[in-house]
């Protein structure tokens, strides 16, 4: 049985509070069970040097964890003076997947910064950040369209992300930290509202997995992502 | 008149939500008007090297701002690779003032980390961090006493902090950002519940100030701090 | 047609020169077409702090590129003072996948460092590094067993890695840089000699992909990896 | 009694050697007892980015300590690769207080860099740096006026700084290191020649202090600063 | 007798493989006994800021060692986040000596980057880097002249470098690591093809040396450099 | 003619003020013409890790320049966060040459730190640092012997250093900055009181030099160093 009594194909309760940070162009506090992430979107009227004069925009993400988002206090990355490898990996993933559903030309020469700051961590912080980042992005785009900065909606599809894995030999949806840390196989999946894949990252943590395992996990992820997309679509 | 219609000796509305971060030993979300800070306290069973074998504890603070806590997105300090001068100054202030009301010997050979993370900034973030940090500290000490880690209460007095300043020639209590940025004189005061000073930091931003100005500002601060202490004492 | 005239399911020529760096415990110069990577394995008789007293070993990897491994000279990471996000991501991938085929307890309290330094880059440097890192690892383990440092072979299975992708609508095996940079979908696959998955990383670069696309790419990767494993098995 | 036999309201001997560094636009070696600081002023014909096109100048300060300015050799900050929190705090203080007596518009689009390097430290290095920095600044301004770079004198008032504190229950002026390290209350005061306050920084090191204590310390500081200003006015 | 049986005035076998890195403008794998260095030359069409608008070019060098170029694995400089003192010293030496034989005005406003990466180290890596860097530089200049980028040959003379030293009281040519680490006197000499000195760096490692010792070592170095220049001149 | 009217074989006026920094174990302010360096020696009762349990001591040096030691203000290395290549090179040189005249076993398990801080720079700062560092070292050793920390004098010989060079075709002794910056050949020589070489660093800045040039420069340096040694021997 799962630590919190869920069925293997059941998500943790989702709670989404939009407009959590008034200063931001778009923002959300997203909660999946005990995992809580503040996501903001910030529009900047310039693009990074490598996009200069290409008449298109950019979306980039940064990810952080408050020192006491974890059961044992973590060292602050600003104090250590280095952004760690895991952080780099996660922020590249968030930026890349969000860019996949945005028409960067319609964005114009603008950068949208997505900041995902984990205030409590209980597994699945990177997938919650993608989902929350998407919601904040949509809010910021709406605001920019209302202000006439952007004329055509650059967002091509909705997206959401979830983790799946094999724990004690069972394929399970939406792993909490206790499951994640003992998973035999661990996978993060990002999909569009239209049911296609944006990103698959599957890792054999304890033993290699078969194609059959892979297909089971993909089905679980599809189910979970469909449910999250439904929640997003029903927000105000 | 003040930007938000307050009287010169009036605080902004205070809201304090304790136990905001479940993982922490003590935590609070403190709000003064639009300024919002998450404060956590974390107990670690060791002391920094310079206190080795002195049979006493330590309290240290770290302060950060989420990138979009401000109207214009700030660079993340972990990204710049350096903790800035202002951050250093603030975290030294928080740690020093909290240590002033704690009997470090009663704490035993432990460090309490106070993390203050600003999620929205509208002036007074350092004083809100001291007040919030104190509340989180008290919660953590209670928890440690309940667990039998600490036998005698090491907290000697309550403390709270507020900013005051001279704006457009008028002494004012609890400056919001719009006032702070045009203040002629700017002062941060930390006092105990018993009415004594822990820290006075007064700066002539535009013109030097007289002893009379100083005394007016101290009176305003005393009034504000008394009110905040009353709110803290009435929490659950 | 592919830039180098290959068929879509055809690997680039592989060349493997073992014992390329005499000082190392195991080493190889691996070439896939114009991609060339020096991989070394170094045995150190201690483990990282987090494994202290757990009676098991560790495998960790570092990855670098010579400044002129690329058509345009790159900034040296030692000069920039920071290991970049892409580098972090790759070295975490190499370490994780190699650990997946090693019984760390049989290794004893030792760390094996795998260093992968790209001397020429033409796509697929991370998968070549995994394959080359595996060969260097095997050499180092042999040497340690001959020296009596290790008594039982800790390597549980062989592994190899390859990239696949969709380019101009066609699923292709082993992308060179010209293909990789215009791929619609890009995937790195790591598999064992026994045909199971260690890692799947698939990314929609230009458009989301379907489950059918995924299955085609996995088949291509399986074919390529089987061929590489055969080459490895036939070395000396 | 005080360690060096002074009365509680007595300054240590002051020695000021102007033009100590020939290369600088203004320079001084200032000594207060055993505390010795080299201060230089350097005029640069540009302003920091945030002042661009505002038709005014800037004054900024940097502070350092030679490794053997202290009884036990300190680590060099260039070696540690980080400017510490205390250094940041002090250099911000020096810059801010000097700017308070300068009309930045009369300075024109120039930056004056004040460098304060402690060659021997025996308490009061930050206040000696402010006083010495002011003298170097005046020299540099004179030189710039003689050269016709600046037409109207931008310096509005003289300034000096001193530390005061409560030691063994007694309010004392100009603490040496032995006193500073055991002070119950510690205060740094910066005042103008016209008797007004530029900065007050008071800290309860051992116990909170009353308003009465504060007023005693302010009177001591006023007396000391008046004496220092007199010395400055009598130079050459 | 010498560890490898050479006579005191005998070089180790030299092997030079030009065009080792296809991507580079010029490249070489140079081997002196067991010391092996990859040198590349990269032409960039701009100059460093300090040469702006001076109508001349620049040559600069960077030096690195693969982590397992040494018998015991070294920490990667990118990982430590700092380029060490020895590396700085060597890359300044390489750049300075190569510039001494180049007419920077004939180069035009271009920078040539010389990268020297040691893949195996057995003494003399800095002198091998100078010799190899020179060969790569010549190749890059030829390529630039063929492409019409440069019209007149900027290279004024050939250069080569070698180490000499006093070991067990005997002056010896081309020290291997075992000799270098016990040398009483250690000297690196860079000379032109026309027999003049570019750089002499002699260090008393164990005891001070006389002018007579110096002259013996210079003669040995002259002999060795003449032989290396002959090898270079005979390359295809 | 030389900028300051000296003859080609004439030193600039030397001034040596011992015990300049009271806190240090040994200290000196050394001046050669307008070049002024504060050198201190600090004894620490431990050795670096690589000398652990070898029953011998170590001497290491650090070198810095005050920001306004130069005609145009330099960036502070602590601010840039990096110790530059030139600084690294110089401090390695100072440490190496001082170690050459000290019997490290007689020093016992101690480190002597030599800090050389340039307060005004007019050429020859590295050679002045070696000479000044030697004087500070001698003072510190005397103090340690008086205190009974060291029983036998570990200093085997005196040492001094000077720069020489070819300027406008003429060999000259003790170059000032104006000469150094236009020198055709530039050489730094370190010798013992007994007339032997510790270090020779000669660089062709504009054209390669002959053995005859070398011998002329060595003679000039010998003359200068003999004179400096005489000054040192005549101090109190």
From Swiss-Prot, chains A, B, C, D, E, F:
GO terms for molecular function: 3'-5'-RNA exonuclease activity; RNA binding; tRNA binding; tRNA nucleotidyltransferase activity. GO terms for biological process: rRNA catabolic process; rRNA processing; tRNA processing. CDD domains: RNase_PH_bact. Its EC number is 2.7.7.56. It is an enzyme of class 2 (transferase). Keywords: Nucleotidyltransferase, RNA-binding, rRNA processing, Transferase, tRNA processing, tRNA-binding. InterPro entries: ExoRNase_PH_dom1 (IPR001247), ExoRNase_PH_dom2 (IPR015847), ExoRNase_PH_dom2_sf (IPR036345), PNPase/RNase_PH_dom_sf (IPR027408), Ribosomal_Su5_D2-typ_SF (IPR020568), RNase_PH (IPR050080), RNase_PH_bac-type (IPR002381). Phosphate binds at residues 86, 124-126. It catalyses: tRNA(n+1) + phosphate = tRNA(n) + a ribonucleoside 5'-diphosphate. Homohexameric ring arranged as a trimer of dimers. Belongs to the RNase PH family. Phosphorolytic 3'-5' exoribonuclease that plays an important role in tRNA 3'-end maturation. Removes nucleotide residues following the 3'-CCA terminus of tRNAs; can also add nucleotides to the ends of RNA molecules by using nucleoside diphosphates as substrates, but this may not be physiologically important. Probably plays a role in initiation of 16S rRNA degradation (leading to ribosome degradation) during starvation. PANTHER family: EXOSOME COMPLEX COMPONENT (PTHR11953), EXOSOME COMPLEX COMPONENT RRP41 (PTHR11953:SF0). This is Ribonuclease PH. The gene is rph.
